[in-house]
Amino acid sequence: TAANVKIFNTEEVQNFINLL
């Protein structure tokens, strides 16, 4: 579960960078 959350967090960060 913790790993899943970490992966989701990373994907969100990438999405944010994409917006920039």
Curated annotation (Swiss-Prot):
GO terms for biological process: beta-ketoadipate pathway. This is Catechol 1,2-dioxygenase. Transmembrane segments: none annotated. Binds 1 Fe(3+) ion per subunit. Its EC number is 1.13.11.1. One of its GO terms (molecular function) is catechol 1,2-dioxygenase activity. Keywords: Aromatic hydrocarbons catabolism, Dioxygenase, Iron, Oxidoreductase. It comes from Acinetobacter radioresistens. It comes from the Bacteria. Belongs to the intradiol ring-cleavage dioxygenase family.
